[in-house]
Structures are given as structure tokens and as C-alpha cells.
């Protein structure tokens, strides 16, 4: 590389002798592996003391939808188990998922070079955070059981790229079942 001072406050750099060789820098997180978190919930029946609850095994169907571009769990429709548990499986968040969301939410970010295929160049050393929101909808009926009037719940997963190669995910709510 040859650098010349043009005398106008601008330095001009010229590359010489590449002969078909080039350098390509690649930014990956977690060794290229996604970061995962389970989307689980629970169907809860409340009943007066002394009453036996109805058997609800498989009686309620839960469907998950994600906002545009959100990675989806292993299953998008499930029924509840005998204990009321609901398990959609793992959601795998990749750096590509993260970068597509970031580029959509931050088009003004000149430090991010959005590419046509949805990938984006990383901003080394600067933490970035995006959120993916999912809606879980319940359907089903059991004689003697009054369903909750609010048949939908939302769950938000926050994914952070620390800018140094680590991608992490947290969930809101953070503790217990994702939804009840």
C-alpha cells in the first residue's frame, strides 16, 4: 500500500502488487453456532378446594406466531400435557437473524453495511441488541372449564451481540414458564 499526501488534507492510498490476492475479514459469534432458548408455557386451571380438576390432557391447542423475520421454534402448534405444560421446543437465533433485524430497525446506522441477502457487516467492539416478539394463542374447550378471556399472550426474546464474538439471548418473562 502506498500512501500519498495530496496537500489538501486528504491522504490517498493505492494498493500495489495484489496479484489476485485479497484479505477478507469475517465476523462470527459463538464460533458460528446459533444461541438457543426454549419456548415453554403452562396451562393453569384454578379450582376451589375440594374439587377435582377436569382432565385437560391434550384438550387445549397452542399456536405461536412470530413477527416478520423472527426465527421460529421447532414446533408452531402443540397441545398441553397432563400437567398443563406446553413445549414448542427451541428457538435458534443466528447472527444472520440478528443482522437482518438490526438492519430493518436501524437503516440510518452507517456503521452497518446492509447487504442484499439480509446479512450485515458487524460493528466490531460495539454491543447491539434486538428483540423478537412472539404471540401464543390458545384454543380449546373442556366441559366445566371457563376459558381465560385473554386467549393470547406475548413473549419477547432479546438477543445481544456484544461486538466481541458473543451472541446471547434472554427472555421476558425471565423466570418460569414463558406464558401461563
What are these regions (language model features)?
Residues 1-180:
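Solvent-exposed loop/turn and edge beta-strand elements of beta-rich ligand-binding domains
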Amino acid at each position: 500500500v502506498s500512501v500519498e499526501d495530496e496537500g489538501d488534507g486528504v491522504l490517498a492510498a493505492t494498493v500495489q502488487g495484489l496479484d489476485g490476492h485479497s484479505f477478507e475479514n469475517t465476523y462470527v459469534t459463538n464460533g458460528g453456532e446459533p444461541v438457543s432458548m426454549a419456548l415453554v408455557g403452562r396451562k393453569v386451571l384454578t379450582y376451589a378446594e375440594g374439587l377435582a380438576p377436569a382432565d385437560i390432557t391434550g384438550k387445549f391447542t397452542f399456536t405461536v406466531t412470530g413477527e416478520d423475520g423472527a426465527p421460529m421454534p421447532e414446533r408452531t402448534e402443540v397441545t398441553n400435557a397432563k400437567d398443563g405444560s406446553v413445549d414448542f421446543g427451541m428457538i435458534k437465533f443466528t447472527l444472520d437473524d440478528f443482522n437482518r433485524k438490526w438492519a430493518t430497525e436501524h437503516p440510518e446506522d452507517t456503521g452497518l453495511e446492509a447487504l442484499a441477502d439480509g446479512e450485515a457487516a458487524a460493528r466490531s467492539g460495539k454491543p447491539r441488541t434486538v428483540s423478537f416478539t412472539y404471540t401464543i394463542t390458545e384454543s380449546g374447550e373442556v366441559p366445566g372449564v371457563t376459558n381465560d378471556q385473554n386467549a393470547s399472550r406475548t413473549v419477547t426474546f432479546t438477543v445481544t451481540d456484544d461486538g466481541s464474538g458473543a451472541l446471547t439471548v434472554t427472555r421476558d418473562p425471565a423466570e418460569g414458564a414463558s406464558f401461563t
